[in-house]
Amino acid sequence: MESQRNILLIGLLFVSFLLWQQWQADQAPQPVAAAQTQSSIPASTVADSHSSDVPDADSAVPEAITASKELITVFTDQLEIKIDPVGGDIVYSALLSHKLEENGDDPFVLLEQTNDIYYIAQSGLIGRDGIDSSVKGRAHFDSASREYKLADGQDTLSVPLTYVSDKGVTYTKSFVFTRGKYNIAVDYKINNTSDASLQVQMYGQIKHSIKKSESSMMMPTYLGGAFSTDDIRYEKYSFDDMADKNLDDSTLGGWVAMLQHYFVSAWVPPATEKNIIFSSMKNGLANIGFRGELHDIAPGSEQVIKSEFYVGPKDQKALSVLSPSLNLVVDYGFLWWLAVPIYKLLMFFHSIVGNWGFAIILITLTVRGLLYPLTKAQYTSMAKMRNLQPKLAELKERFGDDRQKMGQAMMELYKKEKVNPMGGCLPILLQMPIFIALYWVLLESVELRHAPFMLWITDLSVQDPYYVLPILMGISMFVMQKMQPMAPTMDPMQVKMMQWMPVIFTVFFLWFPAGLVLYWLVGNLVAITQQKIIYAGLEKKGLK
């Protein structure tokens, strides 16, 4: 009977998890209409030390403009980038090592401007002597070439854009790319050859047209903003949050990002400077960005203002190098403390076997091995409970409907026979958090995107295209159920639920990532093997 109760407990916990997950999605506000506008960020968002001549954020940070016909194209080993010489904005990015479709040739495009989506990374100089303004327009930069390419044997590539103001001040905006990396150093060098001091302030922001995340009950994903300050290590700030309230946070360092499934774009200003983290929503565009410190540049002097922009996969190692908290955009949910070691163990096994499917199998064997002492105690407790059934039936006949006396007598019997009636539940309770944590690891880790296993399983991060694994998983549950006969004391409703449980689980798992179904299937097969071994030992001790 304990086995049946355990399976029912699995079902209850599993369904509860799915319902809780769907409730979270349902409670989230729907995206606002594209035409909705918000008031500008007030001038108070500028740090107190700033001059009153600095315009407010909405006028200082220019609106998006149509890209120039002649874009500057940059090729590295990882990126294809297009830069608009008007303003020097990054208006297109293709990730050459990540394909749009499995086994396809086209790269995954993150930043782009099309009829369906507007997603760019904008940066500029504002302030009294800034060269970017929604009133005066953007700086028109000159470039020595319309195409740059990282050559073989070359580790870095610099793309300089120059602009000379009517005062004779030279502004050089440089994009520095590094082999093997997705982060771009975006620097401004201001050579003040005028006879007056200059005041400029760098900003960087990410603009994204409002659209709904392509999410489902079994594959929930997030599309929206996120930020970090010295008080808040990581917080999502959705399009709806931006519509409700503009961000206005002062911080030392920090970062802002736009997230989607597996990929991220982020501005990371200098960690030693005081920055303003802001957001706004206007004309159907969600904006999240930063404004740096106000820089005074004396006549005849030169100054460099630095920042970093990342556009690529949610690679935890690469992100943590840019900022200690940027890797948190790989969001494993409330069980992150369990998911992180699972991810690291999965990476370790993959480094050995070179296949993510076999790495998942090794994770399963490890978990089942660690839980084996508890599993053995579980089956031992179940065997003792079965042997107690005649005595329990006798107590039920003796006390009839007196539940209080019946309960007391049962507890005394359990104590006398050294049986824990809940002993069979602990392994199940421990497995569920591991299952949920692995679920988020498979869902969030870009390493699993388009990761093949064998035969027909060519992508472990999505559902089995032929539903073979879920069906095998259902069969394994049915076998486990048959190995443990129904207790005669079970009521008809429990019997019906038990009979339908493998079918219900199979239906649920049809849309789960194949890697997760593989984990559960292998876990069931190991459990069947362990059950046979443990029962053989119990029979020798007279327990059946």
Swiss-Prot record:
GO biological process entries: protein insertion into membrane; protein transport
Annotated stretches, region: Disordered: 34-58
Compartment(s) of residence: Cell inner membrane
Domain of life where this protein originates: Bacteria
Alphabetical list of Pfam families matching this protein: 60KD_IMP (PF02096), YidC_periplas (PF14849)
GO CC annotation, single: plasma membrane
Signal peptide segment: none
Gene3D superfamilies membership: 2.70.98.90
Annotated CDD domains: 5TM_YidC_Alb3, EcYidC-like_peri
Ranges of compositional bias, category Polar residues: 39-49
Single Gene Ontology MF annotation: membrane insertase activity
Chief localization: membrane
Record keywords: Cell inner membrane, Cell membrane, Chaperone, Membrane, Protein transport, Transmembrane, Transmembrane helix, Transport
Transmembrane segments: 6-26, 345-365, 423-443, 460-480, 503-523
Membrane topology recorded in Swiss-Prot or TrEMBL: Multi-pass membrane protein
Keyword Ribosomal protein: no
Subunit structure: Interacts with the Sec translocase complex via SecD. Specifically interacts with transmembrane segments of nascent integral membrane proteins during membrane integration.
Family under the similarity heading: Belongs to the OXA1/ALB3/YidC family. Type 1 subfamily.
Purpose: Required for the insertion and/or proper folding and/or complex formation of integral membrane proteins into the membrane. Involved in integration of membrane proteins that insert both dependently and independently of the Sec translocase complex, as well as at least some lipoproteins. Aids folding of multispanning membrane proteins.
NCBIfam families xrefs: PRK01318.1-1, PRK01318.1-3, yidC_nterm, yidC_oxa1_cterm
Protein name: Membrane protein insertase YidC
